[in-house]
């Protein structure tokens, strides 16, 4: 009888430990899900619109809480919901903030101007090859975003779908983490 009682006690201990590990796994999964939704998440670059800064397939760490501590700044690389419509609509876009609320943004002679001053853009490799874009004033709470790829037709951005509200921006792209050889802060 003691042998049978020992097996029963062992089985109860094993089941209790299995249950405890299951509870820990559910809690860890829940915390990681919340962390991914509200703090940091991983995004994959799709397309060429941010070349030469970002290339197809690179993985980014997106800081989702950065915008809770302050608005996007000029030059920030952000991930946003695609505001466009149509068959080429994507879930998310990666773009650079070039115009802040109240700014006047235009493309003149294939160069970007913000508030009448030619923007310094060390991250681009060519002048803008798309047609010039008439001056637009960025509304309060909105941002003018562009892709770094200035070759003709290479970026679907605020020149095509207009300014984007802060609510459309889900986070700031903080790092390139893959491929690891390109690990870098943005």
Where are these regions (language model features)?
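Mid-length scaffold segments of soluble, non-membrane domains
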Residues: 92-117
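Soluble extracytoplasmic domains of inner/organellar membrane proteins
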Residues: 129-157, 161-171, 176-178
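Protein maturation boundaries and topogenic segments
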Residues: 1-90, 164-168, 172-186
């Amino acid at each position: 009888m003691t042998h049978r009682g020992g097996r029963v006690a062992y089985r109860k201990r094993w089941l209790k430990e299995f249950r405890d590990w299951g509870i820990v796994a559910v809690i860890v999964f829940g915390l990681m899900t919340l962390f991914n939704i509200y703090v940091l998440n991983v995004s994959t670059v799709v397309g060429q619109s941010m070349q030469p800064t970002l290339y197809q397939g690179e993985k980014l760490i997106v800081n989702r809480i950065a915008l809770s501590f302050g608005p996007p700044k000029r030059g920030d690389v952000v991930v946003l919901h695609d505001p466009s419509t149509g068959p080429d609509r994507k879930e998310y876009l990666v773009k650079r903030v070039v115009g802040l609320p109240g700014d006047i943004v235009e493309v003149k002679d294939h160069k970007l101007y913000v508030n009448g001053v030619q923007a310094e853009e060390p991250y681009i490799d060519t002048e803008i090859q798309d047609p010039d874009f008439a001056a637009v004033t960025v509304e309060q709470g909105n941002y003018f975003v562009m892709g770094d790829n200035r070759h003709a037709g290479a970026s679907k951005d605020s020149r095509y779908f207009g300014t984007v509200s802060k609510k459309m921006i889900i986070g700031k792209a903080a790092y390139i983490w893959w491929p690891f050889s390109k690990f870098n802060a943005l």
